[in-house]
Swiss-Prot record:
Residues 2-104 form the SSB domain. PANTHER family: SINGLE-STRANDED DNA-BINDING PROTEIN (PTHR10302:SF27). One of its GO terms (cellular component) is nucleoid. This is Single-stranded DNA-binding protein 1. A motif (Important for interaction with partner proteins) lies at residues 174-179. HAMAP family: SSB. It comes from Listeria innocua serovar 6a (strain ATCC BAA-680 / CLIP 11262). Residues 103-179 are annotated as: Disordered. Gene3D superfamilies: Nucleic acid-binding proteins. Homotetramer. Plays an important role in DNA replication, recombination and repair. Binds to ssDNA and to an array of partner proteins to recruit them to their sites of action during DNA metabolism. Residues 115-130, 145-161 have a biased composition (Low complexity). One of its GO terms (molecular function) is single-stranded DNA binding. It holds the Pfam family SSB.
Length: 179
């Protein structure tokens, strides 16, 4: 059996960070995910999916994501229930994120620098958005933000990314496209 969810969408509001009585960080947020089809009016509808992330990734989500940020979530579906104030059973279905990927550079969210954070508990070496060409991959489980920031201080700030958005349209013809 398998319980696996992969989502890409935008946060509908800033993440909420709380701590359990034992001091464990937990962040909750809602992701707006567009459907792949259009309705009768030709518009794409969206699903609003509640997500929860625990421990250090929760703190990173709260620190680096905000309303409108694009994020990728890899996790599982969980349904829990509790007794509400009126005595009725309340069921909650949410995504428990095992990994949260920040899919936009920090400077598009009001921050600065490269987006070299890889969220989650996995030890993969995927980088999303940072300009790390020619650097050796690190196996730090996604928690090397401080180390990466100190490494970036040793380099002069140059933008060698030909795909960086400087607000100008890209001059390309259809003949240049491979499809």
């Amino acid at each position: 059996m398998m319980n696996r969810v992969v989502l890409v969408g935008r946060l509908t509001k800033d993440p909420e960070l709380r701590y359990t009585p034992a001091g464990v960080a937990v962040a909750t947020f809602t992701l707006a995910v567009n459907r792949t089809f259009t309705n009768q009016q030709g518009e794409r509808e969206a699903d609003f999916i509640n997500c929860v992330v625990w421990r250090k990734p929760a703190e990173n989500v709260a620190n680096f994501l905000k309303k409108g940020s694009m994020a990728g979530v890899d996790g599982r579906v969980q349904t829990r229930n509790y007794e509400g104030n009126d005595g009725k059973r309340v069921y909650v279905t949410e995504i428990v994120a095992e990994s949260v990927q920040f899919l936009e550079p920090r400077n598009s969210n009001g921050g600065g620098g490269n987006n070299n954070y890889q969220g989650g508990n996995n030890n993969n070496n995927y980088n999303n958005g940072g300009n790390n060409f020619g650097q050796a991959p690190t196996n730090n489980g996604g928690f090397g933000q401080d180390q990466q920031q100190s490494q970036n201080q040793n380099y002069q700030s140059t933008n060698n990314d030909p795909f960086a958005s400087d607000g100008k349209p890209i001059d390309i013809s259809d003949d240049d496209l491979p499809f």
